[in-house]
C-alpha cells in the first residue's frame, strides 16, 4: 500500500474497502530493501458517528451488537471517564501516554480478544493533542463467572540457545492443552520480562517479534501483559521513552479488567533510568522500583468505582512488593504466607 502521508510519529496508508478482517505483517519497502515493522490486525467496527465536544480530543463508542454499552470506564491513563447512556465517551487528553483503554466490564469480553495480543481493550493514539481522534471498542456478552487465569513471567526470550523452541514445546504446549481441555474460559497473564533487553538489538528480538511469534505459533489463550524491567528499550534513558515500544506493541503499562466477580489490576513498578543509554549504545539498564503517583491516582479512582467492595481483587506487578533476605530454599509441608 502506498504511504499517503507522514508525521514525525506516524505514517498513513489507505486501507482498501474489501480488505478482510485478518492479521497482516507490515513492512516498509524502499526499492529492493524491506524492513519488518509490526504485525497488525484489521478489525471491522461500527461507522456510527460520535458527535464532537469542545475540549475533547479522544472520543468513541463502546458497543455490543447494535447497541452502546453504558457505564464502561475509559481512560488514557491520566483521565478516566464513563460511557453515557448511548455508549459514547469523550476524554480531554494530553495524549502523554499514547494510548486509550477500557476497563473490561463484568459479563463482557472484547470482540477482538484474540491471539494477536491486541486484546481489543486498548488502542494506540495516532494524532497530535490538538486533533480529535476516534477509537471504538466492540464487546460481546460472555460468561466468565468461572474462569482460569494462568500466570507466567520472566520468559526472557531472545531467540538464543533454543529458548523459543523450549518455550513453544513447554509453556505454550502445556497451557494450550490445558485450555483446550478446560470446561471454562482460560486466560493468561504474563507478568513481565517477556523479552531480554540485553539482546533486543544483538539478536534482533524485541517486543514486536515476541508478539508476532506468539501469534504465528497459533497460541489461542488470550494473554494480558504486565511490564517488566527487561521490556524497556536499552538504547534510551528515562521511563517514558523506555516504555514506548512496550505501549505501542502490548498496550497500556497499567490498566484493569473484570472477569466474573474478580477485578484484576495490572501496574508498572519499573521506573526506567538506564544510565548511559543512547542510540546504538546499551545503558546500564538500572531502574527504581516504584509505582508512580500517576498510577496511584488512577488506581484510587479505579478501585473506588468497583461497586462490590467484597469482590476478589488481584493486583499484578513485575517486581515483588516485599522481600525477605533471610529466606532459605527448602521443601516444606505447606507454602508460607507471602
Q: Locations of the language-model features?
A:
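N-terminal active-site segment of His-dependent metallophosphoesterases
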Residues: 49-57, 64-65, 109-201
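Active-site neighborhood of phospho(di)ester-bond hydrolases with catalytic His/Asp-centered motifs
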Residues: 151-153, 187-193, 221-229, 314-318, ...
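Short, acidic Ser/Thr/Gly-rich low-complexity loop/linker segments typical of extracellular
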Residues: 3-7, 70, 75-93
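Short, ordered, surface-exposed loop/turn motifs in non-cytosolic proteins
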Residues: 55-59, 63-78, 96
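Active-site environment of divalent metal-dependent phosphoester hydrolases
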Residues: 157-160, 196-199, 227-236, 272-275, ...
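Immunoglobulin-like IPT/TIG beta-sandwich domains and homologous Ig-like subdomains
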Residues: 1-36, 77-79
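Extended active-site neighborhood of metal-dependent phosphoesterases/phosphodiesterases
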Residues: 105-127, 131, 200-304
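His/acidic metal-ligating clusters that form di-metal
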Residues: 176-187, 218, 263-265, 277-338
Amino acid at each position: 500500500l502506498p504511504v499517503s502521508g507522514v508525521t514525525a510519529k506516524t505514517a498513513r496508508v489507505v486501507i482498501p474497502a474489501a480488505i478482510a478482517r485478518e492479521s497482516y505483517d507490515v513492512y516498509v519497502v524502499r526499492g529492493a530493501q524491506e524492513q519488518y515493522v509490526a504485525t497488525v490486525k484489521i478489525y471491522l467496527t461500527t461507522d456510527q458517528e460520535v458527535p464532537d465536544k469542545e475540549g475533547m480530543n479522544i472520543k468513541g463508542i463502546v458497543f455490543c451488537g447494535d447497541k452502546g454499552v453504558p457505564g464502561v470506564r475509559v481512560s488514557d491513563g491520566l483521565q478516566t471517564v464513563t460511557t453515557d447512556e448511548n455508549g459514547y465517551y469523550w476524554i480531554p487528553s494530553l495524549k502523554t501516554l499514547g494510548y486509550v483503554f477500557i476497563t473490561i466490564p463484568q459479563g463482557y469480553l472484547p470482540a477482538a480478544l484474540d491471539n494477536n495480543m491486541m486484546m481489543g481493550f486498548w488502542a494506540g493514539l495516532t494524532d497530535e493533542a490538538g486533533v480529535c481522534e476516534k477509537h471504538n471498542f466492540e464487546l460481546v456478552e460472555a460468561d466468565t463467572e468461572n474462569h482460569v487465569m494462568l500466570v507466567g513471567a520472566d520468559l526472557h526470550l531472545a531467540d538464543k540457545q533454543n529458548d523459543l523452541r523450549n518455550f513453544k514445546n513447554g509453556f505454550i504446549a502445556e497451557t494450550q492443552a490445558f485450555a483446550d481441555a478446560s470446561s471454562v474460559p482460560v486466560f493468561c497473564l504474563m507478568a513481565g520480562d517477556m523479552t531480554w533487553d540485553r539482546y533486543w538489538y544483538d539478536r534482533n528480538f524485541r517486543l514486536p517479534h515476541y508478539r508476532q511469534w506468539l501469534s504465528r505459533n497459533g497460541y489461542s489463550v488470550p494473554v494480558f501483559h504486565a511490564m517488566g524491567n527487561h521490556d524497556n528499550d536499552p538504547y534510551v534513558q528515562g521511563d517514558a521513552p523506555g516504555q514506548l515500544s512496550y505501549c505501542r506493541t502490548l498496550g497500556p503499562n497499567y490498566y484493569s479488567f473484570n472477569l466474573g466477580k474478580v477485578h484484576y489490576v495490572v501496574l508498572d513498578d519499573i521506573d526506567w533510568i538506564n544510565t548511559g543509554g543512547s542510540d546504538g549504545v546499551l545503558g546500564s539498564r538500572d531502574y527504581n522500583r516504584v509505582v508512580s503517583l500517576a498510577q496511584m491516582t488512577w488506581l484510587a479512582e479505579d478501585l473506588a468505582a468497583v461497586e462490590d467492595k467484597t469482590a476478589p481483587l488481584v493486583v499484578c506487578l513485575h517486581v515483588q512488593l516485599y522481600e525477605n533476605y533471610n529466606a532459605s530454599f527448602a521443601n516444606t509441608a505447606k507454602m508460607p504466607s507471602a
